[in-house]
Amino acid sequence: MVLIRVLANLLILQLSYAQKSSELVIGGDECNINEHPFLVLVYYDDYQCGGTLLNEEWVLTAAHCNGKDMEIYLGVHSKKVPNKDVQRRVPKEKFFCDSSKTYTKWNKDIMLIRLDRPVRKSAHIAPLSLPSSPPSVGSVCRVMGWGTITSPQETYPDVPHCANINLLDYEVCRAAYAGLPATSRTLCAGILEGGKDSCVGDSGGPLICNGQFQGIVSWGGDPCAQPREPGVCTNVFDHLDWIKGIIAGNTDVTCPL
């Protein structure tokens, strides 16, 4: 009965979702159903985001995905025909880089969510490890999510789409977007010639480079996937001490400047 209620709620959310958000994968293909057991679907205030399961109690996503009445779904592939092992959770606690929950396009767009109860691992639910080494420019990266697959007109898929993009030099993003500082805790990821990118609805989801979880999708150009307008992601490696500290119960830990 509980599972039936969860699946019904997911279908209702799919039908009521207003197709508004901050980032979706352009130029990709349907993800393999078995390649994203760590990918979570976040609904809030009629918006949609992605996120990443770190362990049975914690999800990492973008700070700008914070909202009221958040619902977190795990084990999802098709939203219309859910897997039997889909699980629904809500936040027990949320943690931000500072108490004011402030962030900018180049700093602190990161949020840790402690779930209301532990997740049960299953065929379609498993955590993703934090990175063991820093990201390297030139890496091939995988981006994924249920975001729009067309831009500027928005077309939202039933299943997550995945695309391979490259980790670019930060100066490429500085040239594309006025106002970015000389240094930041972000990554620049995309295809120089355009055609592939995260987009509206993908925010908060993972950027996986050479097999390691290196970024959190944050923002990008509008329309998405334009030449020399890559996506910008929060650098996970730069925030490892904060992430590990919060999970360990040290709420006094601070984010890097």
From Swiss-Prot:
Disulfide-bond pairs as recorded: 31-162, 49-65, 97-255, 141-209, 173-188, 199-224
GO cellular component, as recorded: extracellular region; secretory granule
SUPFAM superfamilies xref list: Trypsin-like serine proteases
Propeptide, residue positions: 19-24
Record Pfam families: Trypsin
Enzyme class: hydrolase
Tissues expressing the protein: Expressed by the venom gland.
GO biological process, one term: regulation of blood pressure
Catalytic activity, EC: 3.4.21.-
MF GO annotations: serine-type endopeptidase activity; toxin activity
InterPro entries reported for this sequence: Peptidase_S1_PA, Peptidase_S1_PA_chymotrypsin, Peptidase_S1A, Trypsin_dom, TRYPSIN_HIS, TRYPSIN_SER
Keyword Disulfide bond part of the UniProt annotation: yes
PROSITE patterns: TRYPSIN_DOM (PS50240), TRYPSIN_HIS (PS00134), TRYPSIN_SER (PS00135)
Leader sequence segment: 1-18
SMART domains per the UniProt record, alphabetical: Tryp_SPc
Domain Peptidase S1: 25-248
Alphabetical UniProt keywords: Disulfide bond, Fibrinogenolytic toxin, Hemostasis impairing toxin, Hydrolase, Hypotensive agent, Protease, Secreted, Serine protease, Signal, Toxin, Zymogen
Active site positions: 64, 109, 203
Other notes: Negative results: does not have activity on gamma-chains of fibrinogen (FGG), and does not coagulate human plasma. Does not induce or inhibit platelet aggregation.
Assembly notes: Monomer.
Name the record gives this protein: Beta-fibrinogenase mucrofibrase-1
Organism encoding this protein: Protobothrops mucrosquamatus (Taiwan habu)
